[in-house]
């Protein structure tokens, strides 16, 4: 059992809705530390990465990317913190914050692996670039940036690019893609299980295939779990909810199967927004899923 280091990233600059910066606090309040300590893990909480201020329009220069400078700076700090955690032989567990923070997490983790795999558990593909993004929100770009596509301020975080390869990525739970993203996923040959596949195959088979696929090709796997991957009835407190999502039960099963397979080497849970939530339900769901990921069982 690897010791776990928790890093909070109160980032809300990768999108426009207020409140997601309170996600790390909400998950701590929902008892993440106590839950993992009950499973006999050695836990340290490294506190939060400092986040700069939102940029005014005139400060953005010619960039279509909202808050590019502040997002890049925070991700550089996060990459350095995660790098340190991995160097110390600990498991980095990152609490978001919007999904733009995955750029920093992956930058810190990937340098320690030859072939890092990624499970992207999300309603969205997050493979936009400045050219394809309808919004200019960086939380829709972290996977593209980590694959080496997009603005150099994002792709070069941690001082190297790319962090990961398309054939080492599996997308699960996707049900909302922009046109440019569909083209990107097809062209790069990224393995994807949309909700259509999840419904047809069932979650057990999706996870069995995902685990077998990554075990064969990678030497470590990062889990990037966006709470909007779940259906809004189970996880209402997210900034970009999409109906028809993964259930709590399916997600719980997915985490249990990952725990049994023992392939996950780092993880982040993102997009918990307490302002949009109902009585901290979404943060509690996130913490319950972390419990399952780290081996919590009913019996």
UniProtKB/Swiss-Prot annotation:
Keywords: Arginine metabolism, Hydrolase, Manganese, Metal-binding. PANTHER family: ARGINASE (PTHR43782:SF3). Its cofactor is Mn(2+). GO terms for cellular component: cytoplasm. Mn(2+) 2 binds at residues 122, 124, 226, 228. Disulfide bonds: none annotated. InterPro entries: Arginase, Ureohydrolase, Ureohydrolase_dom_sf, Ureohydrolase_Mn_BS. One of its GO terms (molecular function) is manganese ion binding. It catalyses: L-arginine + H2O = urea + L-ornithine. The lineage of its organism: Bacteria, Bacillati, Bacillota, Bacilli, Bacillales. Pfam families: Arginase. GO terms for biological process: arginine catabolic process to ornithine; urea cycle. The keyword Hydrolase applies. Controls arginine catabolism. Pathway: Nitrogen metabolism; urea cycle; L-ornithine and urea from L-arginine: step 1/1. Belongs to the arginase family. The keyword Manganese applies. PROSITE patterns: ARGINASE_1, ARGINASE_2. Binds 2 manganese ions per subunit. Substrate binds at residues 124-128, 135-137, 178, 240, 271. Mn(2+) 1 binds at residues 99, 122, 126, 226. Its EC number is 3.5.3.1. This is Arginase. Homohexamer.
